[in-house]
Design a protein with these regions (language model features):
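N-terminal glycine-/serine-/threonine-rich phosphate-binding loop
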Residues: 1-83
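Structural motif
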Residues: 9-12, 38-41, 70-73, 86-88, ...
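Conserved active-site and cofactor/substrate-binding residues in soluble primary-metabolism enzymes
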Residues: 22, 26, 35, 50, ...
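Anionic-ligand-binding alpha/beta catalytic cores of soluble enzymes and soluble regulatory domains
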Residues: 127-196, 201
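A conserved acidic, glycine/proline-rich C-terminal tail/linker
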Residues: 194-254
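Pepsin/retropepsin-fold aspartyl endopeptidases
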Residues: 248-274
Length: 274
């Protein structure tokens, strides 16, 4: 274990590894081998397998709540072992470590990269001959631990132009003649259907959502509709979402990731169900 100057920095973990296998625990073990005093926080490990867009969304919505200098480790890596770069990025709020596949593009759209490097210095890897299928263990976890322990980002490898980093081509909402068209970009544990339409589009407006031929009223709280009814509202992360009061919108409405929807703007006296 190398000597470091920082003992109590924070590392977050995000992956599509789930909780059935040992992969997450193995990465935590590698981090502890580098520096057992580091704090490790699980963001989530239930990202749908190989779904970089969902990983991007989750990290983008989580990172603002962590202290300055936090190292965010993201491993949703369908291209593991290929020519895709392994990277570390410094931005205003901390650091990002993982594959260069667009997983960090949501964060970097809000906070541009200050410094980015390709992880070419194997001194900071677990082994100089990493597995072709588990860079999370052999490259990303140890690099994140060293970075959180005070190693400068420049020591980790060759500096690269931040403009060269992969930007994920995610679906954007767009204005229509009657409102805003978008899609479902995330489904949470409660079955709430989170769209890619930000709160700013519906502020100070009367609105509803149309999806799969169903009109759903836009409200402020779950209790604004009867128990068991569908509702559209702005969720805690600032996106228009669809829920069922006391129920599971995903299961009850049979709506899935990337299904299309439209926010419709209503006249002051117009009913959403009219």
């Amino acid at each position: 274990m190398l000597e470091h100057h920082v003992n109590h920095a924070l590392v977050t973990l995000l992956s599509d590894f789930g909780d059935r296998d040992v992969y997450v625990a193995v990465m935590k073990g590698v981090i502890a081998q580098v520096n057992p005093k580091l704090q490790v926080v699980d963001l989530m490990h239930q990202v749908p397998a190989q779904d970089i867009a969902v990983a991007r969304f989750c990290l983008m919505n989580a990172y603002p709540y962590f202290p300055q200098g936090t190292v965010h480790l993201g491993v949703v890596d369908p291209g593991v072992g290929s020519q895709r770069k392994a990277i570390a990025v410094k931005f205003a709020g901390g650091f990002l470590v993982g594959p260069d596949n667009g997983i960090f593009s949501g964060v970097l759209a809000q906070n541009p990269a200050i410094t980015s490097v390709e992880l070419t210095n194997s001194q900071y890897w677990r082994t100089s001959q990493p597995s072709k299928t588990f860079h999370g263990r052999d490259i990303f976890a140890p690099v994140a631990a060293h970075l959180a322990s005070g190693v400068s980002i420049q020591q980790l490898g060759q500096e690269i132009d931040p403009r060269s980093l992969v930007k994920l081509n995610v679906k954007q909402c767009n204005q229509t003649k009657t409102g805003v068209a978008g899609c479902i970009q995330y489904i949470d544990h409660f079955g709430n259907l989170v769209s890619n339409i930000p709160e700013s589009y519906v502020q100070a407006k009367k609105w509803c959502v149309q999806i799969s031929g169903v009109m759903i009223p836009g409200c402020e709280t779950y209790s604004d509709v009867p128990f068991g009814d569908a509702i559209a509202l702005v969720g805690s992360h600032g996106w228009v979402e669809i829920a069922v009061n006391g129920g599971n919108a995903h299961l009850q409405m049979h709506i899935n990731f990337y299904d299309q929807l439209e926010v419709l703007f209503l006249h002051k006296n117009q009913n959403a169900l009219a």
